[in-house]
């Protein structure tokens, strides 16, 4: 259900049927399908292949500071996925201008990159590109936006999102995740001190604590666009709104227990037509809150005014029946 591959009857959706044809991990496959639709397949082939192999960046114990400094040059402060794209471009440039394989190997090592893992990354990228070609997918040549790439990633990572806990105690996990979990940002991430209110992670790793690795800042609105099939919605305080001219309610949506939005005004008529009609009759018609030039409404309002004037003149308060009887 998370990948929108099956419906509420547990039958394959159109997305599920496409995923079933791909010889890939379902999450990776879902990202690629979304990337095809978002027109960012070139970027996703790079990221998906990177997520399928061991991280090529090395951090030897005897040179941790130097390695961190080298890796920071290719880091992005909003997304670890963007850092992978920068790293790929760096590697491709080195390959393009290599003088020999030996020189290339030495060059990669000097930047604390594992030549063997880089080769694995390139090989897997080639395999994914072949699959995309066999499916007849078009790889766009123009660069995709941050939003396009991360919407596609989110399609495969909806279960790995988190929102910042604003009142978290020092040392406590700063993020609340899906289904009640809490997690920290991986210490090696450039986003450690720059992570936003909402993040998504490629993976959650349990060591001494639960950590989110390879993360990116995301917008809560993206969760609606990509995860609409998973949102649980509830509605409160249905009421007549004179300005809107209809019965409205407040909507709250959650994704795996995380509040995506709350107190959103939505039309109530489509949600509960019978109750909305009752509120309309009581608050709009009986209480005279409806703004209309309809003859029947003007007639009723005139009768109410005349009866109230009669009550005032006769000093009786029981001529006009109460709202319940009018309703």
Predicted regions and their residues:
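Extended, charged helical/alpha-beta scaffold domains that provide interaction surfaces
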Residues: 2-10, 15-327
């Amino acid at each position: 259900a998370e990948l929108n591959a099956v419906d509420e009857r547990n039958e394959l959706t159109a997305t599920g049927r496409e995923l079933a044809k791909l010889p890939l991990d379902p999450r990776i496959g879902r990202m690629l399908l979304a990337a095809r639709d978002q027109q960012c397949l070139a970027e996703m082939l790079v990221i998906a292949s990177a997520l399928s192999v061991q991280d090529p960046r090395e951090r030897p114990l005897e040179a941790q500071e130097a390695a961190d400094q080298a890796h920071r040059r290719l880091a992005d402060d909003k997304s670890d996925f963007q850092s992978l794209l920068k790293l790929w471009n760096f590697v491709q440039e080195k390959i393009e201008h290599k003088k020999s394989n030996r020189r290339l190997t030495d060059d990669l090592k000097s930047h604390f990159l594992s030549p063997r893992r880089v080769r694995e990354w390139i090989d897997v990228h080639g395999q994914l590109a072949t699959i995309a070609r066999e499916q007849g997918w078009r790889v766009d040549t123009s660069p995709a936006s941050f939003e396009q790439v991360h919407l596609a990633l989110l399609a495969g990572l909806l279960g790995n999102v988190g929102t910042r806990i604003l009142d978290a105690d020092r040392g406590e996990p700063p993020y609340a995740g899906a289904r009640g979990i809490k997690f920290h940002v991986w210490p090696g991430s450039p986003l450690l001190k720059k992570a936003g209110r909402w993040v998504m992670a490629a993976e959650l790793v349990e060591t001494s604590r639960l950590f989110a690795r390879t993360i990116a800042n995301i917008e809560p609105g993206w969760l609606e666009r990509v995860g609409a099939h998973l949102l649980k919605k509830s509605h409160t305080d249905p009421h007549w709104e004179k300005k809107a001219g209809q019965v409205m309610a407040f909507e709250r949506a959650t994704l795996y227990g995380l509040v995506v939005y709350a107190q959103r005004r939505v039309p109530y008529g489509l949600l509960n037509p019978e109750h909305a009609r009752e509120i309309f009759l009581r608050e709009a018609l009986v209480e005279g809150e409806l703004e209309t030039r309809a003859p029947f409404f003007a007639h009723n309002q005139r009768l109410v005014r005349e009866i109230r004037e009669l009550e005032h003149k006769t000093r009786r308060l029981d001529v006009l029946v109460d709202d319940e009887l009018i309703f």
